[in-house]
């Protein structure tokens, strides 16, 4: 079991979640169902939580793959 992870590994995981989140937004636009809306919202909540925790730990979210406007796709419908 890995007790610690390096920053690159954490960045890779976060970037993957961001990618899946943006895909969920596209799915919601193509097929606006309550499931797809809920899925996109869930990704936003996860990413927002991680972003906030990074800031609390005095880490720059950009160093972990967050673009400056990472929230914009969630709110530009």
Feature map (PLM): residue ranges:
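Amphipathic alpha-helical interaction segments
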Residues: 28, 49-52, 72-74
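Short, charge-rich amphipathic interface segments used for partner binding and complex assembly
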Residues: 34-66
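Extended, charge-rich alpha-helical interface modules
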Residues: 13-23, 57-77
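Aromatic-enriched hydrophobic runs in primary sequence
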Residues: 1, 43, 71-75
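N-terminal acidic leader/helix
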Residues: 1-37
